[in-house]
Amino acid sequence: LAGFFSYKLKAKRTVLELSLRGHYYASLGEFSPEPRLGFKYNLTDDFRLKGAAGLYSQNLIAANSDRDVVNLFYGFLSGPDNLQDFFTDEDGNSKEITSNLQKATHGIFGFEWDVTRYVEVNLEGYVKYFNQLVNTNRNKIFEDNVANRDLPDVLKKDFIIETGTARGVDLVVKYKRKNYDIWGVYSFQKSDRWDGVQTYSPVFDRRHNMNLIATYRWGKDNSWETNFRWNYGSALPFTPNQGFGQSVQFEEGIYGDYTSENPNSIFNVLGDLNSSRLSDYHRLDWNIQKVIEVREHQTMEINVGVTNVYNRDNIFYISRTTSEAVYQLPILPSLGMSWTF
């Protein structure tokens, strides 16, 4: 259950928006008030400052594992209500946990600049403080029961509290003329998490991301159009294998002889959490299309395209056991047609 109130104030050069959102999470029996602020100030006719800040909350956690080299699919779970009672921050200070919600504080500041009639620049910097996050507990080695009640929560809880930060800059440059558009988008960000034991980089901590898009139109009524899109993403973190071991089962209990057993199964010995990086991702796609007016109110569109023009091997999946890599789409031509009437 949620509701919000918003008030927008417009002056000669300033737009100010104040809002208050309220969320009631029935599964946890918690209410979360979230004030937010946004503004835009026209410094000149061509240059505008803007910013926003606010409190945010959510009750969903991703059901993926850090033990996978690459996560192919993401599921989501409702946040648990049996979290630890106390959390130790990076400075060694212990604080009591009074809420089961995930909470964050966001701040954004930037500007918009109309450099010329054809060129626009948009630059934003942001910082996000994750005051409280919930994650699956990779440090669990004991059951959470009465027999283990004196053990630390970090060794027995299914889910644990984490904190973290994310900082970054987003830059967008647009160049638009009558027949062609060119877009350049660049993002830099750094994210880290503290789980009460260690600081680590989350699996989505991609330092650099870039998109270059170019579109050109020509012919009668601009019926021809071609475009290129190139995307680059720097390497994502993963937890490497440190080694392998055989799982001795001790099926005969204390009377078994482990020196003569020959187990059929092996297990992975993992290295430091997300301490390695995959290869960089980049890909070029090209497309050309022609719009044909068959008759009044009827048009046909023919598309020819190539995905991954230079056949880059981008990682899709890596097997933990064999280290075999599966790659994403190879060079892939396509042909399509649509009829609109």
Please identify what each model-predicted range represents:
Residues 42, 83-154:
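Membrane-embedded beta-barrel scaffold of Gram-negative outer-membrane proteins
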Residues 13-16, 46-49, 118-121, 179-183, ...:
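Repeated loop/turn-to-beta-strand initiation elements of outer-membrane beta-barrel proteins
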Residues 231-264, 277-285, 289-341:
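C-terminal beta-signal and adjacent terminal beta-strands/loops
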Residues 1, 31-33, 103-107, 163-167, ...:
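Residues that define the transmembrane beta-barrel architecture of outer-membrane proteins
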Residues 1-26, 30-36, 171-190:
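Surface-exposed extracellular loop regions of Gram-negative outer-membrane beta-barrel proteins
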Residues 18-22, 39, 51-55, 64, ...:
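Transmembrane beta-barrel strands of outer-membrane/channel proteins
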Residues 10, 126-129, 141, 146-238:
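Gram-negative outer-membrane beta-barrel transporters
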Residues 3-9, 37-41, 99, 109-113, ...:
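Residues on the lipid-exposed face of transmembrane beta-strands in outer-membrane beta-barrel proteins
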